[in-house]
């Protein structure tokens, strides 16, 4: 179930394709997305969206756009 997939995201009028993978995490899941050289982990939050965890700084608007795309895919 950890098969990689491509996540297409339209950000600032440009279509981006990010490598991503689904990860089982106990009773829930995480989705790891490679943005540039940084792996950003998205996990479900209490409101039905996704929160981002990253070790390096990443554009906040881009993270919000990716999180919204993931929320749409999970519905």
Predicted regions and their residues:
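Cysteine-centric segments in proteins
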Residues: 1-75
């Amino acid at each position: 179930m950890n098969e990689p997939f491509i996540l297409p995201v339209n950000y600032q009028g440009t279509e981006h394709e990010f490598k991503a993978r689904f990860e089982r995490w106990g009773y829930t899941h995480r989705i790891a997305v490679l943005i540039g050289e940084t792996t950003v982990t998205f996990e479900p939050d209490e409101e039905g969206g996704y929160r981002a965890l990253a070790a390096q700084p990443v554009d906040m608007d881009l993270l919000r756009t990716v999180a919204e795309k993931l929320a749409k895919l999970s519905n």
